């Protein structure tokens, strides 16, 4: 690994530009290539394999870091923190999980960047508790306008984020009570036209690509796990689960299944309950 491409070697904007050009030159891995390297690292502790996994994903870290550019924090630092998350993810990645490294690593990358933002962006110091941090990192996704939430929107946001409505109001107030020098230019201040600072938005719209990629990988992984879990059930249990839960257009009633199998509806309910329990256990094993 050259000094130019080493994840921690970021100091100035010029070196960052050079770094980005360098990491974009590393080829992306196919699924088979990635698995081979992951197995070498996981089972044999192969450091060269770890380097291969890291280098091939450095461009993804840059992509994620750009989503946090609105804070005015040095992009080099954001990338550097993201790289720390990537290295932690590579160290913990198990090739038997059945997902691509990018899906696993994105959580670690974002976690490191989030912590960096919370440590260094002065306005974010308003978010100190776990609930407040959760609100801070999700509130902008729920806002449909720049003004205050109405009561209905507060209830919706609170329900979606699993917090109390009062906490939503408190965080909204804290976000509104910004540092004026950071929030407004002198001209805007003189004209009485304060604007909402872009730092209120953790990630810009360009980060959706990473989110979509992550979602697609996890959806495929979940579908595979569900199929394998269903296959572990007996034929009758499979049919009951499919008829009751997997056929959205024609969901079968307990009574219909009872007549089909010549048993009571209560017996079908018991079979369904047992099948769902086994299915949950089986999904957890794969």
UniProtKB/Swiss-Prot annotation:
Species classification: Bacteria, Pseudomonadati, Pseudomonadota, Gammaproteobacteria, Vibrionales
HAMAP family, alphabetized: Sigma70_RpoH
Gene: rpoH
GO biological process, one term: response to heat
Functional summary from the UniProt entry: Sigma factors are initiation factors that promote the attachment of RNA polymerase to specific initiation sites and are then released. This sigma factor is involved in regulation of expression of heat shock genes.
GO MF annotation list: DNA binding; sigma factor activity
Domain of life: Bacteria
Family: Belongs to the sigma-70 factor family. RpoH subfamily.
Name the record gives this protein: RNA polymerase sigma factor RpoH
GO cellular component, one term: cytoplasm
């Amino acid at each position: 690994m050259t000094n130019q491409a080493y994840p921690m070697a970021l100091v100035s904007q010029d070196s960052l530009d050079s770094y980005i050009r360098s990491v974009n030159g590393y080829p992306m891995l196919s699924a088979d290539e990635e698995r081979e390297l992951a197995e070498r690292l996981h089972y044999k502790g192969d450091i060269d394999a770890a380097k291969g996994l890291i280098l091939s994903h450095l461009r993804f870290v840059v992509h994620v870091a750009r989503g946090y550019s609105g804070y005015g924090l040095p992009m080099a630092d954001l990338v550097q923190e993201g790289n720390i998350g990537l290295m932690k993810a590579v160290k913990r990645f198990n090739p038997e999980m059945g997902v691509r490294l990018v899906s696993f690593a994105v959580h670690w990358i974002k976690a490191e960047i989030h912590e960096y933002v919370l440590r260094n962006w002065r306005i974010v110091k308003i978010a100190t508790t776990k609930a407040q941090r959760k609100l801070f990192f999700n509130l902008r996704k729920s806002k449909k306008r720049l003004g205050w939430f109405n009561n209905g929107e507060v209830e919706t946001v609170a329900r979606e984020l699993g917090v109390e409505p009062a906490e939503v109001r408190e965080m909204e107030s804290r976000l509104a009570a910004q540092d004026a020098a950071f929030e407004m230019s002198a001209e805007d201040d003189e004209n009485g036209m304060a604007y909402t600072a872009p730092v209120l938005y953790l990630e810009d719209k360009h980060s959706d690509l990473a989110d979509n990629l992550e979602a697609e990988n996890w959806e495929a992984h979940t579908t595979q796990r569900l199929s394998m879990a269903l296959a572990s059930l007996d034929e009758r249990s499979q049919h009951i689960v499919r008829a009751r839960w997997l056929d959205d257009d024609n969901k079968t009633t307990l009574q219909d299944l009872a007549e089909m199998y010549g048993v009571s509806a209560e017996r079908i309910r018991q079979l369904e309950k047992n099948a769902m329990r086994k299915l949950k256990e089986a999904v957890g094993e794969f």
